[in-house]
């Protein structure tokens, strides 16, 4: 096997996207298109990877980091000109170079491997990746002679009626002999209507020199889909979503309705977990084995251990330990850490809090900036009052405490273990171990006062 390099073309602005975000940074299943391409390239054995950036260069670099080298195309003068910007990094390299666009998120590493293998087997100077398009309109056609050798690539606008009937199209992905690529690039011209240097001109130059130009036809046309507008972005997202969902199902995850299940590319799910319809799993969410994610739940960068149940709830940047459950209609906000066998019932909001093993927060409760120990009971309507108008303060509740319904815990506050807060109390001072705190007015009953009220109802 020869030395292999890759050039990813990611310099275009993408005006048809009609967006402030640069085209290759639009996301497909939670991941930038150019990141999808780089991820698949990384799975192959590459010596060097160079990404050509232009519009939004800093944003692209921030997204991809140091996983690739970068070349800047300051002026957008065509694909050939873009590749030429990598010359300082690649011109002295032997072997072969893959060229792929950053707006083609559906390519698989296996396709690149097959393309390299075909190129090397044919001893070609260039190999074009082609596919059979159901509707080839708009694509460059691959014209072969009667024994299957590539004669030329003809663009839609230049194709005659016979050539327009050809369904084999140019996907825009190539493998070149690296030395011959850069030599031929210096022979290209911008003497055309667009005033640009085209990479396809290199193919013609190599043929004129008598070099072998091959074409490898890939099996799956969908992989070659380029994204130029929001319609294509939606189509690519659907294909990727179906691919991701199928992979999880084959790994032992049950998706009740894959058509309404949305799983980002970075999500990991353990076997025997069940996902109900309408679920969104985003970012770097990790779900263990034997979990149950109920309908219309959304998890964003959440980490769930085994045997966790989520019922119609939103979890953000938080984690839940084994045997815990939440919902329905509850919300874990960032930096929440839920211990084993914790029960968070309906309409519970937790923010930047740690809740210990076996604690129960039944319903209609806000827990913010707090540390709760083990086996605590938090009654209905409890509020952890954490904000003084300027700063957030912390409440600490010890093991085996009991917080009665409709209580307010005003931070900063310490409630010791084995203590008891009476229902309806507003607690502002520390509560010691074994104490019961009551902070409410005594009830006053006024005899016969009902008859003095403007509205008395039926006698």
Curated annotation (Swiss-Prot):
GO BP: any one term: peptidoglycan biosynthetic process
Linker: annotated segments: 231-251
Entry EC number(s): 2.7.7.23, 2.3.1.157
Keywords: Acyltransferase, Cell shape, Cell wall biogenesis/degradation, Cytoplasm, Magnesium, Metal-binding, Multifunctional enzyme, Nucleotidyltransferase, Peptidoglycan synthesis, Repeat, Transferase
Region (N-acetyltransferase): 252-459
Positions with a binding annotation for Mg(2+): 103, 228
Cofactor entry: Mg(2+)
GO terms under cellular component: cytoplasm; membrane
Subcellular location: Cytoplasm
MF (Gene Ontology): glucosamine-1-phosphate N-acetyltransferase activity; magnesium ion binding; UDP-N-acetylglucosamine diphosphorylase activity
Cofactor note: Binds 1 Mg(2+) ion per subunit.
Subunit structure: Homotrimer.
UniProt cross-references to NCBIfam families, sorted A to Z: glmU, PRK14354.1
Listed name of the protein: Bifunctional protein GlmU
Name of the gene encoding the protein in the UniProt record: glmU
């Amino acid at each position: 096997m020869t030395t292999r390099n890759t050039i990813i073309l990611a310099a275009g602005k993408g005006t048809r996207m009609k967006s402030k975000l640069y085209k290759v940074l639009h996301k497909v299943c939670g991941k930038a298109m150019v990141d999808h391409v780089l991820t698949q390239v990384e799975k192959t054995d590459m010596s060097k990877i160079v990404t050509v950036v232009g519009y939004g260069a800093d944003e692209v670099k921030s997204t991809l980091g140091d996983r690739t080298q970068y070349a800047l195309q300051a002026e957008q003068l065509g694909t050939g000109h873009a590749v030429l910007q990598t010359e300082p990094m690649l011109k002295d390299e032997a072997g072969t170079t893959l060229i792929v666009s950053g707006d083609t998120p559906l390519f698989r590493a296996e396709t690149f491997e097959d393309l390299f293998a075909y190129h090397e087997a044919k001893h070609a100077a260039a190999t074009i990746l082609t596919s059979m398009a159901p509707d080839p309109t708009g694509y460059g056609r691959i014209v072969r002679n009667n024994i299957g050798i590539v004669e030329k690539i003809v663009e839609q606008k230049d194709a005659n009626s016979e050539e327009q009937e050809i369904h084999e199209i140019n996907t825009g992905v190539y493998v070149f002999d690296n030395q011959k690529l850069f030599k031929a690039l210096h022979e290209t011209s911008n003497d055309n209507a667009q005033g640009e240097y085209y990479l396809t001109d290199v193919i013609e130059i190599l043929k004129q020199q008598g070099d072998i130009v091959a074409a490898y036809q890939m099996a799956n046309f969908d992989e070659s889909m380029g994204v130029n507008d929001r319609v294509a972005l939606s189509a690519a997202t659907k294909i990727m979503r179906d691919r991701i969902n199928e992979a999880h199902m084959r790994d032992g995850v049950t998706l009740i309705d894959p058509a309404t299940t949305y799983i980002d590319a970075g999500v990991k799910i353990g076997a025997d977990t069940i996902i109900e319809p309408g679920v969104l799993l985003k970012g770097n969410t990790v779900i263990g084995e034997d979990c149950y994610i109920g309908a219309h739940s959304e998890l964003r960068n959440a980490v769930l251990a085994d045997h966790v149940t989520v019922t119609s709830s939103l979890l953000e940047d938080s984690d839940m330990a084994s045997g815990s459950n939440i919902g329905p209609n509850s919300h874990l906000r960032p930096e929440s850490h839920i211990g084993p066998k914790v029960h968070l019932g309906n309409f519970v909001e937790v923010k930047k809090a740690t809740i210990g093993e076996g604690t129960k927060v039944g319903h209609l409760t806000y827990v913010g900036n707090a540390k709760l120990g083990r086996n605590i009971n938090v009654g209905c309507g409890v509020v952890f009052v954490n904000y003084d108008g300027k700063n957030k303060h912390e409440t600490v509740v010890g093991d085996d405490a009991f917080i009665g319904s409709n209580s307010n815990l005003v931070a900063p506050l310490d409630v010791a273990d084995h203590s008891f807060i009476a229902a309806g109390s507003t607690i502002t001072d520390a509560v010691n171990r074994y104490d019961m705190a009551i902070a409410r007015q005594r009830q006053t009953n006024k005899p016969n006062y009902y008859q003095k009220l403007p509205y008395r109802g039926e006698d």
